Amino acid sequence: MKPKILVSRKISDGAEEILKKEFDVTLNLEDKPYTYEELIKLVNEYDGLISTSFDKLDKNFFDNLKGKLKIIGHVGVGYDNIHTQSAKEKNIKVSNTPNVLNDAVAEITILLILASSRRVGEAYNLVKSNTWKDHRPDITKLMVGNEITGKTLGIIGMGRIGQIVADRARAFKMKIVYYNRNKLSNDLEKDATYYPDLKSMLPNCDYVSLHTPATSETKNIINSEILKLFPKHSVFINTSRGSTVDDNALIEALQNKKIYGAGLDVFNNEPNLDKRYLELENCFVLPHVGSATHETRLAMSMLAVDNIKCFFSQKPLLSEVV
Protein backbone atom coordinates (compact mmCIF):
# COMPACT_ATOMS: atom_id res chain seq x y z
CA MET A 1 0.00 0.00 0.00
CA LYS A 2 1.38 3.41 -0.99
CA PRO A 3 1.86 6.05 1.72
CA LYS A 4 -0.86 8.69 1.77
CA ILE A 5 0.33 12.25 1.16
CA LEU A 6 -1.66 15.46 1.54
CA VAL A 7 -0.54 18.59 -0.32
CA SER A 8 -1.98 21.68 1.35
CA ARG A 9 -1.62 24.07 -1.63
CA LYS A 10 -0.95 23.93 -5.36
CA ILE A 11 2.69 23.13 -6.12
CA SER A 12 4.56 22.83 -9.41
CA ASP A 13 3.09 20.46 -12.00
CA GLY A 14 6.24 18.36 -12.29
CA ALA A 15 6.33 17.71 -8.56
CA GLU A 16 2.64 16.82 -8.52
CA GLU A 17 3.16 14.29 -11.32
CA ILE A 18 5.87 12.52 -9.33
CA LEU A 19 3.62 12.39 -6.28
CA LYS A 20 0.79 10.87 -8.32
CA LYS A 21 3.07 8.12 -9.59
CA GLU A 22 4.69 7.18 -6.30
CA PHE A 23 2.12 7.92 -3.59
CA ASP A 24 -1.55 7.88 -2.77
CA VAL A 25 -1.73 11.66 -2.96
CA THR A 26 -4.42 14.27 -2.44
CA LEU A 27 -3.54 17.41 -4.36
CA ASN A 28 -5.01 20.89 -4.04
CA LEU A 29 -5.33 21.69 -7.73
CA GLU A 30 -7.64 24.66 -7.15
CA ASP A 31 -5.21 26.09 -4.56
CA LYS A 32 -8.08 26.67 -2.15
CA PRO A 33 -6.63 27.13 1.36
CA TYR A 34 -7.77 24.73 4.04
CA THR A 35 -8.97 26.33 7.23
CA TYR A 36 -6.95 25.60 10.34
CA GLU A 37 -9.66 23.24 11.58
CA GLU A 38 -10.02 21.50 8.21
CA LEU A 39 -6.30 20.83 7.97
CA ILE A 40 -6.11 19.33 11.47
CA LYS A 41 -9.04 17.02 10.75
CA LEU A 42 -7.82 16.04 7.30
CA VAL A 43 -4.13 15.49 8.04
CA ASN A 44 -4.91 12.75 10.57
CA GLU A 45 -5.76 10.52 7.61
CA TYR A 46 -2.32 10.91 6.00
CA ASP A 47 1.23 9.65 6.45
CA GLY A 48 2.84 12.78 5.04
CA LEU A 49 2.04 16.45 4.54
CA ILE A 50 3.53 18.90 2.06
CA SER A 51 2.98 22.31 3.64
CA THR A 52 3.61 25.97 2.82
CA SER A 53 4.12 29.08 4.91
CA PHE A 54 0.37 29.70 4.74
CA ASP A 55 -0.26 26.70 7.00
CA LYS A 56 -0.30 27.31 10.74
CA LEU A 57 1.28 24.22 12.26
CA ASP A 58 1.44 25.34 15.87
CA LYS A 59 1.55 23.40 19.13
CA ASN A 60 -2.21 22.93 19.12
CA PHE A 61 -1.99 21.47 15.62
CA PHE A 62 0.44 18.81 16.81
CA ASP A 63 -1.51 18.21 20.03
CA ASN A 64 -4.49 17.22 17.89
CA LEU A 65 -2.63 14.66 15.80
CA LYS A 66 -3.53 11.03 16.37
CA GLY A 67 -0.27 9.33 15.45
CA LYS A 68 -0.53 8.67 11.71
CA LEU A 69 1.42 11.67 10.35
CA LYS A 70 5.13 10.87 10.02
CA ILE A 71 6.69 13.67 7.95
CA ILE A 72 6.10 17.27 6.92
CA GLY A 73 7.82 18.37 3.73
CA HIS A 74 7.71 22.16 3.97
CA VAL A 75 7.93 24.20 0.75
CA GLY A 76 10.03 27.13 1.91
CA VAL A 77 13.26 27.97 3.69
CA GLY A 78 11.75 29.61 6.76
CA TYR A 79 9.66 27.37 8.99
CA ASP A 80 8.61 29.73 11.77
CA ASN A 81 5.00 28.67 11.10
CA ILE A 82 5.86 25.15 12.31
CA HIS A 83 6.24 24.35 16.02
CA THR A 84 9.29 22.17 15.47
CA GLN A 85 9.65 21.21 19.12
CA SER A 86 6.18 19.66 19.07
CA ALA A 87 7.04 17.85 15.84
CA LYS A 88 10.16 16.45 17.46
CA GLU A 89 8.22 15.32 20.53
CA LYS A 90 5.72 13.57 18.26
CA ASN A 91 8.59 11.95 16.31
CA ILE A 92 7.47 13.70 13.13
CA LYS A 93 10.21 14.62 10.67
CA VAL A 94 10.24 18.12 9.19
CA SER A 95 12.17 19.22 6.11
CA ASN A 96 12.47 22.55 4.29
CA THR A 97 13.79 23.75 0.92
CA PRO A 98 16.98 25.79 1.43
CA ASN A 99 19.52 26.95 -1.17
CA VAL A 100 17.33 26.48 -4.25
CA LEU A 101 15.92 30.00 -3.89
CA ASN A 102 19.11 31.90 -3.11
CA ASP A 103 19.51 33.56 -6.51
CA ALA A 104 15.85 34.56 -6.73
CA VAL A 105 15.86 36.20 -3.30
CA ALA A 106 19.13 37.98 -4.08
CA GLU A 107 17.58 39.37 -7.27
CA ILE A 108 14.58 40.72 -5.36
CA THR A 109 16.95 42.29 -2.85
CA ILE A 110 18.74 44.21 -5.59
CA LEU A 111 15.37 45.17 -7.07
CA LEU A 112 14.28 46.61 -3.72
CA ILE A 113 17.54 48.54 -3.36
CA LEU A 114 17.05 50.10 -6.78
CA ALA A 115 13.32 50.71 -6.41
CA SER A 116 13.71 52.39 -3.03
CA SER A 117 16.61 54.53 -4.19
CA ARG A 118 15.09 55.66 -7.48
CA ARG A 119 11.56 56.13 -6.11
CA VAL A 120 10.13 53.56 -8.51
CA GLY A 121 6.86 53.15 -6.60
CA GLU A 122 6.15 56.87 -6.70
CA ALA A 123 7.13 57.12 -10.37
CA TYR A 124 4.94 54.16 -11.31
CA ASN A 125 1.95 55.63 -9.48
CA LEU A 126 2.52 59.00 -11.17
CA VAL A 127 2.15 57.42 -14.60
CA LYS A 128 -0.66 54.98 -13.70
CA SER A 129 -2.73 57.73 -12.07
CA ASN A 130 -2.42 59.83 -15.24
CA THR A 131 -1.12 62.77 -13.21
CA TRP A 132 2.35 62.96 -14.77
CA LYS A 133 1.10 65.67 -17.12
CA ASP A 134 0.01 67.78 -14.15
CA HIS A 135 3.50 68.06 -12.69
CA ARG A 136 5.90 70.84 -13.60
CA PRO A 137 9.05 69.22 -15.04
CA ASP A 138 11.41 70.53 -12.38
CA ILE A 139 14.59 68.58 -13.10
CA THR A 140 15.86 69.15 -9.57
CA LYS A 141 12.83 67.67 -7.82
CA LEU A 142 10.49 65.53 -9.95
CA MET A 143 11.13 61.89 -9.01
CA VAL A 144 14.76 62.61 -8.19
CA GLY A 145 16.30 59.77 -6.21
CA ASN A 146 19.75 58.43 -5.38
CA GLU A 147 22.27 56.38 -7.32
CA ILE A 148 23.52 53.18 -5.75
CA THR A 149 26.80 53.02 -7.66
CA GLY A 150 29.77 53.30 -5.33
CA LYS A 151 27.66 53.37 -2.17
CA THR A 152 28.14 51.20 0.93
CA LEU A 153 25.88 48.18 1.46
CA GLY A 154 25.69 46.73 4.95
CA ILE A 155 24.54 43.11 5.09
CA ILE A 156 23.13 41.66 8.29
CA GLY A 157 23.54 37.90 8.04
CA MET A 158 26.23 36.88 5.54
CA GLY A 159 24.95 33.41 4.75
CA ARG A 160 24.45 32.05 1.25
CA ILE A 161 21.87 34.65 0.23
CA GLY A 162 23.81 37.49 1.81
CA GLN A 163 26.93 36.45 -0.10
CA ILE A 164 25.05 36.34 -3.41
CA VAL A 165 23.57 39.78 -2.72
CA ALA A 166 27.11 41.03 -2.11
CA ASP A 167 28.25 39.58 -5.44
CA ARG A 168 25.37 41.25 -7.29
CA ALA A 169 26.00 44.55 -5.52
CA ARG A 170 29.65 44.51 -6.56
CA ALA A 171 28.46 44.90 -10.16
CA PHE A 172 27.33 48.37 -9.05
CA LYS A 173 30.76 48.98 -7.51
CA MET A 174 29.21 49.00 -4.06
CA LYS A 175 31.42 48.64 -1.01
CA ILE A 176 30.36 45.66 1.11
CA VAL A 177 30.38 45.62 4.90
CA TYR A 178 28.72 42.93 6.96
CA TYR A 179 27.66 41.83 10.42
CA ASN A 180 27.56 38.10 11.03
CA ARG A 181 27.79 35.68 13.92
CA ASN A 182 31.22 34.68 12.66
CA LYS A 183 33.77 36.21 10.33
CA LEU A 184 33.86 34.55 6.91
CA SER A 185 36.96 32.94 5.47
CA ASN A 186 38.90 35.14 3.08
CA ASP A 187 37.71 33.29 -0.02
CA LEU A 188 34.04 33.84 0.95
CA GLU A 189 34.53 37.32 2.35
CA LYS A 190 36.25 38.58 -0.80
CA ASP A 191 36.66 42.35 -0.36
CA ALA A 192 33.96 42.77 2.32
CA THR A 193 34.69 44.32 5.70
CA TYR A 194 33.56 42.42 8.80
CA TYR A 195 31.99 44.11 11.82
CA PRO A 196 31.64 41.92 14.93
CA ASP A 197 29.22 44.51 16.35
CA LEU A 198 26.07 45.58 14.49
CA LYS A 199 25.88 48.96 16.16
CA SER A 200 29.33 49.93 14.97
CA MET A 201 28.54 48.95 11.36
CA LEU A 202 25.27 50.80 10.82
CA PRO A 203 26.52 54.42 10.86
CA ASN A 204 28.77 53.55 7.91
CA CYS A 205 25.98 52.22 5.67
CA ASP A 206 24.06 53.81 2.82
CA TYR A 207 21.96 50.64 2.53
CA VAL A 208 21.23 47.94 5.09
CA SER A 209 19.95 44.57 3.87
CA LEU A 210 18.69 41.96 6.32
CA HIS A 211 19.27 38.24 5.67
CA THR A 212 18.73 36.38 8.94
CA PRO A 213 16.37 33.52 9.83
CA ALA A 214 13.41 34.08 12.12
CA THR A 215 14.56 33.05 15.60
CA SER A 216 14.11 34.30 19.14
CA GLU A 217 17.48 36.04 18.77
CA THR A 218 16.50 37.93 15.61
CA LYS A 219 12.97 38.91 16.63
CA ASN A 220 12.71 42.72 16.36
CA ILE A 221 16.43 42.99 15.65
CA ILE A 222 15.45 46.14 13.74
CA ASN A 223 14.03 48.29 16.53
CA SER A 224 13.99 51.94 17.57
CA GLU A 225 17.39 51.72 19.25
CA ILE A 226 18.99 50.21 16.15
CA LEU A 227 17.23 52.56 13.72
CA LYS A 228 18.71 55.54 15.54
CA LEU A 229 22.10 54.39 14.25
CA PHE A 230 21.04 54.45 10.59
CA PRO A 231 22.26 57.53 8.68
CA LYS A 232 19.40 59.81 7.64
CA HIS A 233 20.09 59.12 3.96
CA SER A 234 20.09 55.32 4.40
CA VAL A 235 17.67 52.72 3.02
CA PHE A 236 16.56 49.56 4.84
CA ILE A 237 15.85 46.36 2.89
CA ASN A 238 14.17 43.22 4.24
CA THR A 239 13.75 39.98 2.31
CA SER A 240 14.19 37.67 5.32
CA ARG A 241 11.24 37.51 7.74
CA GLY A 242 8.79 40.10 9.03
CA SER A 243 9.34 39.13 12.66
CA THR A 244 12.82 40.63 12.49
CA VAL A 245 11.32 44.13 12.40
CA ASP A 246 9.50 46.19 15.02
CA ASP A 247 6.84 47.69 12.76
CA ASN A 248 6.10 50.66 15.00
CA ALA A 249 9.77 51.61 15.11
CA LEU A 250 10.33 51.32 11.36
CA ILE A 251 7.11 53.12 10.43
CA GLU A 252 7.92 55.96 12.83
CA ALA A 253 11.40 56.28 11.31
CA LEU A 254 9.94 56.44 7.80
CA GLN A 255 7.13 58.82 8.71
CA ASN A 256 9.54 61.27 10.31
CA LYS A 257 12.19 60.90 7.59
CA LYS A 258 14.73 59.55 10.06
CA ILE A 259 15.84 57.27 7.23
CA TYR A 260 15.47 57.85 3.50
CA GLY A 261 13.37 54.81 2.69
CA ALA A 262 12.70 51.09 2.90
CA GLY A 263 12.14 48.20 0.53
CA LEU A 264 10.17 45.34 2.06
CA ASP A 265 9.16 41.93 0.74
CA VAL A 266 8.23 40.40 4.11
CA PHE A 267 6.00 41.50 6.97
CA ASN A 268 4.60 40.56 10.33
CA ASN A 269 1.22 38.82 10.16
CA GLU A 270 1.31 38.21 6.41
CA PRO A 271 -0.74 38.84 4.34
CA ASN A 272 -2.34 41.29 6.78
CA LEU A 273 0.55 43.73 6.94
CA ASP A 274 0.36 46.95 8.94
CA LYS A 275 -1.65 49.28 6.66
CA ARG A 276 0.50 52.24 7.60
CA TYR A 277 3.19 50.90 5.29
CA LEU A 278 0.85 51.47 2.36
CA GLU A 279 0.51 55.15 3.21
CA LEU A 280 4.25 55.81 3.03
CA GLU A 281 5.67 57.15 -0.22
CA ASN A 282 9.18 56.28 0.94
CA CYS A 283 8.38 52.60 1.46
CA PHE A 284 8.40 50.24 -1.54
CA VAL A 285 6.51 47.04 -0.72
CA LEU A 286 6.11 43.64 -2.37
CA PRO A 287 3.85 40.70 -1.37
CA HIS A 288 6.58 38.23 -0.30
CA VAL A 289 7.62 37.29 -3.83
CA GLY A 290 11.33 36.73 -3.18
CA SER A 291 11.20 33.14 -4.44
CA ALA A 292 8.49 33.74 -7.05
CA THR A 293 10.17 32.61 -10.24
CA HIS A 294 9.15 29.60 -12.31
CA GLU A 295 12.59 28.08 -11.87
CA THR A 296 12.74 28.52 -8.11
CA ARG A 297 9.19 27.45 -7.33
CA LEU A 298 9.74 24.27 -9.35
CA ALA A 299 12.99 23.57 -7.51
CA MET A 300 11.33 24.18 -4.13
CA SER A 301 8.45 21.84 -4.96
CA MET A 302 10.80 19.15 -6.22
CA LEU A 303 13.00 19.33 -3.12
CA ALA A 304 9.96 18.98 -0.86
CA VAL A 305 8.87 15.92 -2.84
CA ASP A 306 12.40 14.48 -2.81
CA ASN A 307 12.46 14.74 0.98
CA ILE A 308 9.16 12.87 1.16
CA LYS A 309 10.56 10.19 -1.16
CA CYS A 310 13.72 9.86 0.91
CA PHE A 311 11.75 9.40 4.11
CA PHE A 312 9.58 6.59 2.78
CA SER A 313 12.64 4.94 1.20
CA GLN A 314 14.37 4.94 4.61
CA LYS A 315 17.05 7.34 3.32
CA PRO A 316 18.37 10.47 5.06
CA LEU A 317 16.40 13.60 4.28
CA LEU A 318 18.10 16.03 1.92
CA SER A 319 17.28 19.05 4.08
CA GLU A 320 16.13 17.93 7.51
CA VAL A 321 14.97 20.48 10.09
CA VAL A 322 14.06 18.05 12.89
Located regions from the model:
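Glycine-rich, N-terminal phosphate-binding loop of Rossmann-like dinucleotide-binding domains
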Residues: 9, 52-53, 76, 210-212, ...
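N-terminal Rossmann-fold cofactor-binding loop
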Residues: 9, 178-182
